[in-house]
Curated annotation (Swiss-Prot):
It comes from the Bacteria. The keyword Transcription applies. GO terms for molecular function: DNA binding. This is Probable transcriptional regulatory protein RBAM_007230. GO terms for cellular component: cytosol. It comes from Bacillus velezensis (strain DSM 23117 / BGSC 10A6 / LMG 26770 / FZB42) (Bacillus amyloliquefaciens subsp. plantarum). Pfam families: TACO1_YebC_N, Transcrip_reg.
Length: 239
């Protein structure tokens, strides 16, 4: 758990700033979550998670509202949730989550991204067993001890609490995402620096510089694909 979540978020946001691609990806994810359940986050937990994540990336309100209104309006555009697994340079492990309205387009694009950048796509289950689904919540203005105390008082179980720069990062089971946030909100916390549901590698590996450069290019190419929502990996990039 050595990665710095605020650094990762800032790097991702800056890379996507010119194209607003990150907003488009959130728009798609919000639409799908709202369409699959109620368009009200209070009665749709999946939508609530996406909206909390969107807040930490400062996704504009109009994009959020447009996606929810599109779902309310009964739009017929349907998306499939897909997960691809594969290997990067030096046997590094990668999971790719996608939302697509054309499966026949997405799979070849992901496979090509792997193949052209020193990797190869694996079969389902080939790397996922080395990752744990995890809720990651970050707050400022609290110490790890203070966070632990308020979470214990709220009877919320977490895996770990780490201090990172000016933030405290809480790792918990995915189904504790809202419980962790509510515990902090009840303690006066109004904003979260990190709010993610992620696949966390059980063990991170370091790559030599040449393989690391190729790996970073592979991740960039995968993240730039229109249908790809999230890319998870087990490489320590020094973030």
């Amino acid at each position: 758990m050595g990665r710095k979540w605020n650094n990762i978020k800032e790097k991702k946001a800056s890379k996507d700033a010119n194209t607003s691609r990150i907003y488009a990806k959130f728009g798609r994810e919000i639409y799908v979550a709202a369409k699959q359940g109620e368009p009200d986050p209070e009665s749709n937990q999946a939508l609530k998670v996406v909206l909390e994540r969107a807040k930490t990336y400062s996704v504009p309100k109009n994009i959020i509202e447009r996606a929810i209104e599109k779902a309310k309006g009964g739009a017929e555009e349907n998306f499939d949730e897909l997960r691809y697994e594969g290997f990067g340079p030096n046997g590094s492990m990668i999971i790719v989550d996608a939302l697509t309205n054309n499966v026949n387009r997405t799979a070849p694009e992901v496979r090509a991204a792997f193949g052209k950048n020193g990797g190869n796509m694996g079969v389902s289950g080939s790397v996922a067993y080395m990752f744990d689904a995890t809720a990651v919540i970050g707050v400022e203005g609290k110490t790890a001890d203070e966070a632990l105390e308020l979470l214990m008082e709220a009877d919320v179980d977490v895996r770990d609490i780490l201090e990172e720069d000016d933030s405290v990062i809480v790792y918990a089971e995915p189904d504790q995402f809202h419980a962790v946030q509510e515990a902090f909100k009840n303690a006066g916390v109004e904003e979260f620096t990190v709010a993610e549901l992620t696949m966390l590698a059980q063990n991170e590996v370091e790559l030599p510089e040449d393989a690391k450069a190729q790996f970073e290019k592979l991740i960039d190419v995968l993240e730039d694909l229109e249908d790809v929502q999230q890319v998870y990996h087990n490489v320590d990039l020094g973030e």
